[in-house]
């Protein structure tokens, strides 16, 4: 494990934005503070470094986001959309919505960045506007194993169930 200094972390960035099926994140962005994060977050990005892979046509995909291509990560990103994951259940009431203050209370003394998502306080899918955040947690050590990475994110989700359960594997 490689020690991390302060609240620094590394994101891996694509040269596209909002492309749902993008899997290539070849550009490294060292985050030392809010300004660096704001610059990197303008583009599709991930918290883990991934190796190159081949697509079905045999073409190389640089820094391919995939579990088998996981190399390392020094931060964990979690989402909180304040929505009910079970479509059969009623929507969450506003008094159940979580904010950065709730995350800070759940993780006392743990540094994190809270970034409003692009749908923060916007109506979406027929649901009323609500707070939606991406949370970035700089790690004290670099994780270099996909199973350990997924276990860390799963543990964070178990500790704070309001985090989105769809983004806890090593390919997220």
What are the language-model segments listed below?
Residues 152-156:
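Amphipathic alpha-helical coiled-coil/leucine-zipper-like oligomerization segments
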